[in-house]
Amino acid sequence: MIESQRHSYHLVDPSPWPISGSLGALATTVGGVMYMHSFQGGATLLSLGLIFILYTMFVWWRDVLRESTLEGHHTKVVQLGPRYGFILFIVSEVMFLFALFRASSHSSLAPTVEIGGIWPPKGIAVLDPREIPFLNTPIPLSSGAAVTWAHHAILAGKEKRAVYALVATVSLALVFTAFQGMEYYQAPSTISDSIYGSTFFLATGFHGFHVIIGTLFSIVCGIRQYLGHLTKEHHVGFEAAAWYWHFVDVVRLFPFVSIYWWGGI
């Protein structure tokens, strides 16, 4: 029997996924500590914890898609929650990446005597910012234009154009990741080469990791758009992906200026 309700909120059914995700996080944390201290079984527990977390993410998000797309539980009021929550998530990511860029800027503006009092540190070879770093900077900005194209196509009800635009977005993202992989392969320094190597690989590496997450996000949105899940009235998932992607492509300007250019001149 279908029960009616007099409010626009979604009262979720009991779910096992919060506790399963918590157990996966616990196993990952304990396994990671055991692995770093060379305890027997640490690698196995770490792997099982990561697998458990990935499985929980998949089935939990699957249930959310069913509730929103097939069951119609996500009213306009309900959609405000994910929107506000994702905006706060992006703000937290901005603070995280800003801390990494700030660490690099601080070390370059006030180099200590241990690294020769100069930046880059004495004896450290750096990448030429006019080569792969410069070539790789317009790519995420171009992919941001492609995801905006996809957004306008969804609002106009043009499903095929939205799919094409998302394919373009993902393709540019893969090119960016490939170039960054080449950059790391050709890098004359490593993460253990003084404060320069630590800040360089942490900041650029985490930005690259965010690009990979955004790529997966866009792939899922492309598949959902192809299957007809997204409409001009209901596309919160795509909006979150678009916001995230614009965050990623704009942030690219900061490591290029503060790390590649400032550290390579």
From Swiss-Prot:
GO cellular component: mitochondrial inner membrane
EC number(s) from the headed UniProt entry: 7.1.1.9
Topology with respect to the bilayer: Multi-pass membrane protein
Upper classification of the organism: Eukaryota, Viridiplantae, Streptophyta, Embryophyta, Tracheophyta
UniProt similarity note: Belongs to the cytochrome c oxidase subunit 3 family.
Transmembrane found in the keyword field: yes
Keywords annotated in UniProt: Membrane, Mitochondrion, Mitochondrion inner membrane, Translocase, Transmembrane, Transmembrane helix
Subunit comment: Component of the cytochrome c oxidase (complex IV, CIV), a multisubunit enzyme composed of a catalytic core of 3 subunits and several supernumerary subunits. The complex exists as a monomer or a dimer and forms supercomplexes (SCs) in the inner mitochondrial membrane with ubiquinol-cytochrome c oxidoreductase (cytochrome b-c1 complex, complex III, CIII).
UniProt signal peptide: none
Transmembrane stretches, start-end: 16-36, 41-61, 81-101, 162-182, 200-220, 245-265
Function text: Component of the cytochrome c oxidase, the last enzyme in the mitochondrial electron transport chain which drives oxidative phosphorylation. The respiratory chain contains 3 multisubunit complexes succinate dehydrogenase (complex II, CII), ubiquinol-cytochrome c oxidoreductase (cytochrome b-c1 complex, complex III, CIII) and cytochrome c oxidase (complex IV, CIV), that cooperate to transfer electrons derived from NADH and succinate to molecular oxygen, creating an electrochemical gradient over the inner membrane that drives transmembrane transport and the ATP synthase.
Major subcellular site: mitochondrion
Reaction equation(s) it catalyzes: 4 Fe(II)-[cytochrome c] + O2 + 8 H(+)(in) = 4 Fe(III)-[cytochrome c] + 2 H2O + 4 H(+)(out)
UniProt protein name: Cytochrome c oxidase subunit 3
Compartments where located: Mitochondrion inner membrane
Record organism: Helianthus annuus (Common sunflower)
Record GO terms (molecular function): cytochrome-c oxidase activity
UniProt GO BP: aerobic electron transport chain
PANTHER family with a match to the protein in the record: CYTOCHROME C OXIDASE SUBUNIT 3, CYTOCHROME C OXIDASE SUBUNIT III
